[in-house]
């Protein structure tokens, strides 16, 4: 009788596990792990020209989700085919391939991969910049002692893990680079993954289309899948996608189960996956951080400028990167030719600073207005009481994170682009200052405390008599 009960209990447990596995698909969660390894190693090997073994050790292996599986993770870098494969104990394999001009993309099956034409590739990165030069061709060391001390602290490592792994710091004041420093293996022209800082770039691409009157922020998002007569998602606006207040079930948790990670690493058509999400709240009433929301904007940008990878690359370089003199940029695409505008742009630290300078100058570069008048103010207004604006983080409002930054000495008018592992841009209009810190930081919150200290000490160095 006791044995029978145990067998019944075991059967119930196994049945429950089967149901849970069918719903939550742990295989998909684990595949996001091999997808991250394959994709990020591909990008940092073939775009950034970094050592893949060092990238795995510094960037991937220490991440919280990898601590339990890194021992079983295997990867192969094929320099001849320009691809990276990764697997977990020989299964759940992922493969990423490099494409000229478009960076790396995960291959999920036999899908056709979007490419850029030779004419587009030849035209990229060659147009004359409108932004005045921020520096010459050599590294600019700090000359003010307190500024040098600030950079020393930004690169200093704690006695034990987790590590800061600062890779680059660039500081631009009143349009001129006043200090920069790079870790070994990195330099002025090294393209560095910005992760979610790319969302601020997508904000700019949307802003350019608004300036050209090809998009309207308070109009419904032009996604055909939502245009059914009885589809409540048809009420979601461009602004609500920018502000992550769409009400869609696309909340981001950072786990292998959340929709953003499954979108990035298990879907060839990322926006197609995201646009299938259901509504869980009325649009504009609920905020939740969501890379998938930004990816929907990337699809809208692609479709508005021609619907192909070739068209969106020409648009991004002609209208944004070339005027700013951003020569190192790789804006990666998914298989459909949609920019991965939520997560995957690589650029040198100087180019990230040039991008920040566009916003510092209210969307004007070389006398030409690129972004609509008032766009920067719109982008940095807090959303529903949070510290998030519309593609930028802000110090405005009463969010605890914003209030903390002000308390430690960061001006109230500052706003930020934040990316995973400590990628940071700070734009501070009252100081005419742009600060970029690129890292592979595994300290709490991507070493936010270290970045805040860098900002405060940089400002102090500009005002020695205060």
Language-model-detected regions and their locations in the chain:
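Active-site SXXK
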Residues: 175, 193-221, 241, 297-301, ...
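Structured C-terminal helix/loop/strand segments within mature extracytoplasmic catalytic/sensor domains
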Residues: 29, 414-466
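Short, charged, amphipathic alpha-helices and their helix-cap/turn boundaries
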Residues: 146-153, 176-181, 220-222, 257-283, ...
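Beta-lactamase-like hydrolase cores
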Residues: 134-174
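Active-site helix/loop module of the DD-peptidase/beta-lactamase fold
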Residues: 211-249, 276-279, 306-343
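Active-site Gly/Thr loop motif
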Residues: 326-330, 380-434
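Active-site-proximal alpha-helical segments within enzyme catalytic domains
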Residues: 200-203, 292-302, 343-364, 423-439
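Conserved catalytic neighborhood of penicillin-recognizing serine enzymes
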Residues: 227-257, 263-285, 292-295, 347-350
